């Protein structure tokens, strides 16, 4: 694999992040790292067996070619790609920040990307370890997987939901699952030691809050017609509805649901149904035909940005441009407030005619300083500095077609 650099991209950001992490963890990390003589078995703060802690984000890209089954993990720190077990005929790839879930008709393959982040609120820890194949979940190509630190919820196309112990996945194995009672529309979403779901009952669908045993503990008095799409943010969980979205939050053990309406009639084909955002950000994007919806969760506002036909969209959040990969093969930057285009790259996609091919379309992955765009036919991934006029910072030449791509380590 060849890495082409246009400048040295990460040095300054890494130095700043190192300083921040050193400061934020100094108070408790230094004392915890030196156990007292009377406590020889004390575990240092942030210690994870078998993992290496780092001062900066340990980003990796999971890449898969459904045709050949070739799967790679691209380490964005070293620029090296590593092979892993092949997974053929995958139709979707989703990640929870550490694990990749490759959905096929015969099951869902779980891949531990070996890079993750632990957020302690006032500071974070970044880890890396050897990547490994975990195994198969008995869930088909249309199953939806959602995780938090404790459980992984798998909702199949028939509405049945299974819970898996995520701690077992971290040990490299899939433990037996627990089946939740009832059926559900859309994904069951773990949140604040509970589960959020739209329960099917008597021909209607209603939002419920379940405990981890599947027992209902709350039923917020809100309506959400045709629920579709979800995202976990720092301010709560967003659930897509026909007329906008619900924001579900937990406060002092109580759950509230607030409607964020579009404020206008929106045709079904222009609804926000698949949300994309930078993990940790409160600004969401969703393609909407020839435009992109931007949902500012903090301000509870929707903004529609007219762009032209959209292949993929994303943003790093407040103060950053809206990034849109369009059918001309170029990445475009837009000012969210004004809707005006501010930057544009050269065409990045080798085969523009296939750019909008459903779940196998190229994507935009975004972290705190860079964005990544996959060019399947060109066997390349581009690293974009979105704070510098969409400058191409690096390009990675691969030995596989990166049809499916997801970033871990965030």
Question: Can you say where each PLM-predicted feature lies in the sequence?
Answer:
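C-terminal motif of bacterial Sec signal peptides marking the signal peptidase cleavage site
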Residues: 20-24
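Bacterial signal peptide processing site
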Residues: 25-29
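Repeated scaffold domains used in trafficking and secretory/extracellular systems
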Residues: 42-54, 86-99, 128-150, 178-193, ...
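A short beta-strand motif characteristic of beta-propeller blades
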Residues: 43, 77-86, 118-137, 170-180, ...
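Short beta-strand elements that form the blades of beta-propeller/WD-repeat-like
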Residues: 53-66, 92-111, 142-163, 186-202, ...
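Acidic, serine/threonine- and glycine-rich low-complexity intrinsically disordered segments
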Residues: 193, 199-321
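Intrinsically disordered, low-complexity segments enriched in Gly and acidic/Ser/Thr residues
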Residues: 291-376
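Blade-level signature of beta-propeller repeat domains, shared across WD40, Kelch, NHL, RCC1
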Residues: 374-410
